Design a protein with these regions (language model features):
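Extracellular structured ligand-interaction cores
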Residues: 23, 106-108, 117, 134-138, ...
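Conserved short histidine dyad/triad with adjacent acidic residue
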Residues: 82, 111-128
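A short coil-to-beta-strand element that immediately follows conserved catalytic motifs
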Residues: 102-110, 149
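Short acidic/glycine-rich loop or secondary-structure boundary segments that cap or lie
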Residues: 105, 119-121, 147
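Catalytic core of Fe(II)/2-oxoglutarate
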Residues: 128, 133, 142-202
Length: 202
């Protein structure tokens, strides 16, 4: 077996959890140094007023609806932004396609900032006019985040719910087509920072 097809036990665990549960949580997917670098870049663009108010719908059919979501986003260009993040994501996509024939052909990611009082109500990540999103991904970049700060990701899983605390370097993958979810209101003056996006098929 060539090096390109060697079994990666870390990726295998992610895939196994995802296939069993419809989601997977990895607590330290990014190192402290990597999140520091990404957070610095995010804050640079946020301070330069490059972020825009979030919308519902896909990028071709957006509508502002502040009662549903009111975070701020900055779309990432892989050739210019978040290089340490994309290096890891691309490695995982390559492995996923080779071992599971997942058919991931493209991706889209943005930085997301949730100031105090912001939220994203219960929703699903696919659209009536576009169902190419397959795997949703959220990666957290806050250096410090206490439980009293709010901003948890809440997944609706069959007969139960799961609230995920946004700790630094944690990544969550879940099924874009089936898992409803929401971001609970941020209760602190500290902004909730993340990279959020989707792996997509044709």
């Amino acid at each position: 077996m060539s090096d390109l097809f060697e079994i990666n036990h870390f990726y295998e665990k992610i895939i196994s959890d995802y296939l069993s549960n419809g989601f997977c949580i990895i607590d330290s997917w990014l190192t402290y140094e990597e999140t520091t670098q990404l957070r610095k870049e995010l804050n640079h663009f946020y301070d330069a007023d490059c972020f825009k108010k979030s919308a519902i719908g896909n990028r071709l059919n957006e509508n502002l609806e502040r009662s549903i979501r009111n975070d701020f986003i900055f779309w990432l260009d892989e050739t210019k932004h978040a290089s340490v993040f994309f290096k890891k994501i691309n490695s995982f996509i390559e492995y996923l396609n080779k071992t599971c024939f997942a058919g991931i052909v493209t991706k889209e990611f943005h930085y997301a900032v949730y100031p105090q009082g912001s939220f994203y109500k219960k929703h699903i990540d696919t659209f009536q006019n576009d169902d190419r999103r397959t795997i949703s991904i959220v990666c957290y970049l806050n250096e410090i985040w206490n439980e009293s700060f709010g901003g948890e990701l809440k997944l609706y899983l069959n007969n139960q719910t799961l609230q995920i605390f946004p700790t630094n370097g944690k990544i969550i993958l879940f099924d874009s087509k089936t898992i409803e979810h929401e971001v609970l209101s941020v209760l602190t003056e500290n902004k909730r920072l993340s990279i959020t996006g989707w792996l997509k098929t044709n």
